[in-house]
A protein has these predicted regions:
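Hydrophobic h-region of N-terminal signal peptides that target proteins for export
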Residues: 14-21
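Beta-propeller-forming repeat regions
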Residues: 22-242
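Sec-dependent signal peptide recognition
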Residues: 6-13
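Short, Lys/Arg-enriched N-terminal segments with co-localized hydrophobic residues
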Residues: 1-4
Length: 242
């Protein structure tokens, strides 16, 4: 393949830290130690960043997967970042009680392509069409001081360990990049695109792994696969893990 064509087809999967910053609290420093996951971004399109967070209310509880989960989803309009430390206002501007859904992770991305950030919250609950406790990828918009559901899907194609939002194909729309469990307990990387009503499986990796996780030390989509650091590339409609 010629070098010029290769450059057009090869895309490193990456986040956009200028627009969005998301962290687990173990990876950062934040003034409220009850917060277990947070993102900063302009969720109401007013030209200024907000911080949206999952707060555990000081209870320090964990899911069967050993992941911490919270009770409240909070939005702060006032916060400062000083030498890497995030200092929040004394009280959130908005607080939503999701204690019956056990939220564990919040992310931001424009999944439906309307130019506005959507809010992704991982919940742990039963749903109508899947009567078992499992992690669910719920999506919301923030409008008029409320979290308005965009998509409360029952599940992805398979149970997932974790997922991130990123634009893998440079179409200015965020895709779901998911680490999923197969029937034989191996893991694969799967990508989903918004179809107007929900998410369709777009592509998945051919390679399978016994253990697969995101490298939390970088903003790019990099993996730890069976103990080795691996890069993810999107080439000519395929995912390669190198």
């Amino acid at each position: 393949m010629g070098g010029k064509l290769y450059k057009k087809l090869m895309i490193f999967i990456c986040m956009v830290p200028v627009l969005i910053s998301c962290n687990k609290v173990s990876d950062s420093n934040i003034s409220n130690k009850d917060i277990i996951s947070y993102c900063t971004g302009d969720i109401d399109s007013d030209g200024t960043y907000e911080l949206i967070a999952v707060n555990d209310g000081g209870e320090r509880k964990k899911l069967p997967t050993k992941e911490a989960y919270g009770k409240f989803v909070e939005i702060y309009k006032e916060f400062t970042i000083d030498d890497g430390k995030i200092i929040l206002g004394s009280e959130p501007d908005y607080s939503f009680d999701f204690s019956n859904m056990k939220p564990s992770k919040v992310q931001l991305g424009d999944v439906d392509g309307d130019g506005k950030l959507d809010i992704s919250i991982v919940m742990y609950k039963k749903v109508k069409f899947h009567n078992a406790l499992a992690k669910r990828p719920f999506f919301y918009n923030f409008k008029y001081g409320k979290l308005v559901p965009l998509w409360l899907g029952s599940r992805l194609s398979r149970p997932f360990d974790d997922f991130k939002l990123a634009d893998i194909d440079n179409d200015k729309v965020s895709e779901i990049i998911s680490i999923e469990e197969l029937e034989d307990k191996n893991r694969v990387l799967a990508v989903y695109k918004w179809n107007g009503f929900g998410f369709d499986l777009f592509i998945q990796s051919h390679e399978e792994f016994k253990k697969l996780m995101f490298d939390s030390t970088v903003t790019e989509i990099k993996l730890i696969a069976d103990g080795k650091e691996r890069e993810v590339k999107f080439i000519d409609g395929k995912i390669l893990i190198e």
